[in-house]
UniProtKB/Swiss-Prot annotation:
Lineage: Eukaryota, Metazoa, Spiralia, Lophotrochozoa, Annelida
Protein name: Cytin chain A
Presence of keyword Transferase: no
Top-level taxonomic group: Eukaryota
Family as reported in the entry's similarity comment: Belongs to the protease inhibitor I13 (potato type I serine protease inhibitor) family.
Keyword line: Disulfide bond, Protease inhibitor, Serine protease inhibitor
Protein task: Inhibitor of chymotrypsin.
Molecular-function GO term, any one: serine-type endopeptidase inhibitor activity
Binding partners and assembly: Heterodimer of an A chain and a B chain, linked by a disulfide bond.
Organism (species): Theromyzon tessulatum
Coiled-coil intervals: none
Amino acid sequence: AEVNPPEAFNQDVDTYLKIFRNGRYPLDKMAVICSQTGFKLDK
């Protein structure tokens, strides 16, 4: 399913982290979302 960040990301960070950690969300897009929202991913 397609997602529409950053609004949806702000509403459900946990879901996005699960998607990201499962490798279903491109790293470059995740980096953009993080920069837009100020959210930091743990290494």
